[in-house]
Amino acid sequence: MAVDTAQTPESNSIDTSADNVLEVRNLKKHFYVGGGFLARNSAMTIQAVDDVTFSVKRGETFGLVGESGCGKTTLGQTIIRLYNPTAGNIIFNGADISSLKANDLRNHRRKMQMIFQDPSASLDPRMTVGSIIAEPLNIYGIGSREERQERVRELLRVVGLNSYFTNRYPHEFSGGQRQRIGIARSLALNPDLVICDEPVSALDVSIQAQVLNLLRQLQQDFDLTYLFIAHNLAVVAHISDRVGVMYLGKLVEIGEAKTITEQPKHPYTQALISAIPVADPGRQRDRIILEGDVPSPANPPSGCRFHPRCPVARADCSEQEPLLREVTPGHWVACHYAE
């Protein structure tokens, strides 16, 4: 059951402005894994998302970045309620949807949609493109059959595809075209918030920029708000207004995209930035190599979860967990020694 923990220290990092489309307060998503009949005592808890707090303003793009397994996709799926939260609050358009039942959640969910990572897996191969895009309209009973068909043709044109593609099947399209179909489907109900889960990572580099530019144009045309999830910080910084950096289920840094890329404060963010190639051949960037593997979310380290891999960790980092604190206006860092 979701609980209200809005008064905990890290909740100070959230902007509770009326302009927020989304507020996430101390959100947790834990998975309980049993040991089976022969290992009943080996049950464990996977702390996929652990005490995450942030807000997203109307019309902005908030980027979530981190290594694979950090919990960013689980966070997005919990926000849209594909998973039920273990604890915490999800405030969408001013309403707490954390513990709503299916019938009550229905009207809120139509205003938040998701673009999935792999268009080959997220589009039903047995359905035509027209049926795929029209499915949300059918579920909510919007418009007549003719109006739905016209809406589908309009959405295809909006994402840069020909309107006569409605009777074709997903396998007849390239990866970039299939992702455009997925984007069209996400727009069918005129959402306020679109959660973009690694929307370009499965595409060729030559196609990624086209899809990113399309998302930007659609945001301007339809007043969309994006939660943009990716493992590539360069991509996230390119499209986002603000960025949150996740590590092992927790947010370790939040700030304006330019601030995060030019003045990163958390050692983990600094390591991610150092891996981004520099376009200027006359300029070099010192690469920060992190040693060791990411610890298991079933047994996270004590204190700061990053301390086993941190190049500047000290003794107290393994004992006391750092909370997000504001080091400069709008720039929050969970590190004892960030300045």
Describe the function of each predicted region.
Residues 4, 13-20, 33-40, 45, ...:
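Short catalytic/signature loops enriched in Gly
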Residues 95-96, 147-164, 270-274:
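Conserved ABC ATPase "signature" region
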Residues 188-192:
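A short, proline-enriched helix->beta-strand linker immediately N-terminal to the Walker B motif
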